[in-house]
Amino acid sequence: MNYGVVLPIWQLTAAEAESLAVRAEELGLDGVFVPDHILAKPATTQHYGGHWPDPFSLLAFLAGRTQRIRLGASVIVLPYRNALVAAKAAATVDQVSRGRFIFGVGVGWDEAEFVDLRLPFRERGRLSDDYIRAIKAAWASDVPEYQGSYVSFGGATFSPRPVQRPHPPIWVGGAPGAVSAPAVRRCAELGDAWHPLGLGLDDIEKGYATLRDLASRRGRRDALGLAPRNLLDLTEAPKGSGRAAFQGSVAEVAADIRRVRALGAAWMTFDLPREGVPAMIRAMERLAREVKTTAA
């Protein structure tokens, strides 16, 4: 099992993000992930904050400060950027990190942000599907060709391409708190792993079973991965029945990890507490030293 942490970049300076990534690597964790917004409309500032560094630029910076740890997006909102711009940025991060990039993708949720960016909110799913196909095509050859509903290109060189072949792993995220049928379908058709956000254990199991069934019916023979993302909330005393997944004592959280690992999950990604950098470091230390050991 690989363990990653999602940095709450809306409340971090670049130096703080660097210190957390370096500490995560020192502790033997496997991945550091960052989220994505371009504009912080009221719904975003209410839930998170207004400070949103560009995720690709931040990951490239962290690549120069780390050696081993994987660097990923959780998640890039695909409609926000031209497909070729996103493909170039992702390929560059994969190059400067020497093949450590994980390309988490989603369709977005804040309609007000789409309005200001002059993007069609109700077409974001279809647009994202087209963009994934276009990005894969851009990465597939030095002079790629693609004809899609929203983007078409050809007759030009695209370089650099990613280090990883055929491309960095594409993790498909979905709306938090419930199994997103469109995201499961998108992953079955176009993704490499399902990256559900904030689901309970039963929903993770049901959603992953649906994903594998859809992929099989579409003729896919490769194994689709599972990489849940949940809040890590470690308590000294057990929370007992009725607790949220991955929240409770070390033993309770470790039991949850063993359950998703038995389903086939190769990754578990955790949102860190938002009570400041020292609390985030303590959570990473407990994850690395206590939870990993207990779940092994």
Regions found by a protein language model. Give the residues of each.
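Active-site-adjacent structural elements that line small-molecule/cofactor binding pockets in enzymes
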Residues: M1-A296
